[in-house]
Amino acid sequence: MLDTLLINIGQLLTMDQEDGLLRREAMNTLPVIENGAVGIENGVVTFVGTAEEAKGLQAKEVIDCDGKMVSPGLVDPHTHLVFGGSRENEIALKLQGVPYLEILEQGGGILSTVNATKQASKEELVQKAKFHLDRMLSFGVTTVEAKSGYGLDDETEWKQLEATAQLQKEHSIDLVSTFLGAHAVPKEYKGRSKEFLQWMLDLLPEMKEKQLAEFVDIFCETGVFSVEESKEFLLKAKELGFDVKIHADEIDPLGGAEAAAEIGAASADHLVGASDKGIEMLANSNTVATLLPGTTFYLNKESFARGRKMIDEGVAVALATDFNPGSCPTENIQLIMSIAMLKLKMTPEEVWNAVTVNSSYAINRGDVAGKIRVGRKADLVLWDAYNYAYVPYHYGVSHVNTVWKNGNIAYTRGEQSWSTATI
């Protein structure tokens, strides 16, 4: 007997069309079962099909979804989850046109977050991050990548990674930990970036032994770390057994996209300034392009990543919030879906694949997350919508009704008035 059987699902988005990264037309294809049903037993999906096919199945609990839509739990593959403080005091300065470097000189910017993170205890960081994870869950996210990077010293970086490890044990969301010690060059290492990177590399063996990080990341940008420094750093991290990511070409076409493809990074993230050559190299690689349009939006920039061109040329594109206190303070992945549709010219189908299948591969979870398939853990979302296009269309709010994590209800909004949109 099943533990739970979901029936009368108007649209069941299984996302289960093929294994591996989705590109081109596959990104614009959604496997949808009309009038679907899903069976769950011991936290695992044991049945996926139509309501007609589900007849005769018995379950301890039968949930009538009343024609609403069900999808896999969403995957957010790029966040800066663990940090201290906030930076709302900088908004007025930005609106006045105060340059970021001047804000830094006043103790603001990333330095403000670094100082707040250093001053916070691990438990304070954990409790703050739990609040943000709860919000992510309420938006339908069940798997999250979490970066360090607000320490710029060994003690605080360890504290962030240990906080992430504790959160993995205490929160229902699955976390994937990334070491981003190379987020910026500390003042004391100004002009000595290679020495700083060596210091960060020296931390990796113990980090690997304690299993505190799965990925290593670096911020490759003008005035931070060069392409050659980034490649050398990440290749050494790979030699130590880590998978790697790269903050690439966020502002300038520095060659970060090319570097990511060349070294076989799991993902290249941002890519607003990615060159045509970089896009071509990504298309011919297994590196996921993780685009962060919420950051461009919040920074009030006019130029967004060329998501349409990337998809048309065969790049596997994912979407993420880039949740962080400075350049994208939002946990709302649904808002990111809407911005991607409007500003990156992605179709609703492409947007859904970018927050499920491709985003799972960006963090090496393609075999466990992002799809509804028999044998996989039951991470499911019941939406207050009748069709998938309605979610990114009706922007700025959450359409989530209920979230199941490993077959258990992890979030429910309860009885609400909801859309009567039809296809």
Swiss-Prot record:
Any one of the GO BP annotations: L-histidine catabolic process to glutamate and formate
Binding site for Zn(2+): 78, 80, 247, 322
Chain positions recorded as Fe(3+) binding sites: 78, 80, 247, 322
Keywords: Cytoplasm, Histidine metabolism, Hydrolase, Iron, Metal-binding, Zinc
Gene Ontology molecular-function annotations: imidazolonepropionase activity; iron ion binding; zinc ion binding
Main location: cytoplasm
Cofactor notes: Binds 1 zinc or iron ion per subunit.
CDD domains the record matches: Imidazolone-5PH (cd01296)
GO cellular component: cytoplasm
Cofactor requirement: Zn(2+); Fe(3+)
Compartments it resides in: Cytoplasm
HAMAP family: HutI (MF_00372)
Function: Catalyzes the hydrolytic cleavage of the carbon-nitrogen bond in imidazolone-5-propanoate to yield N-formimidoyl-L-glutamate. It is the third step in the universal histidine degradation pathway.
Protein name per UniProt: Imidazolonepropionase
Organism: Bacillus mycoides (strain KBAB4) (Bacillus weihenstephanensis)
Organism classification: Bacteria, Bacillati, Bacillota, Bacilli, Bacillales
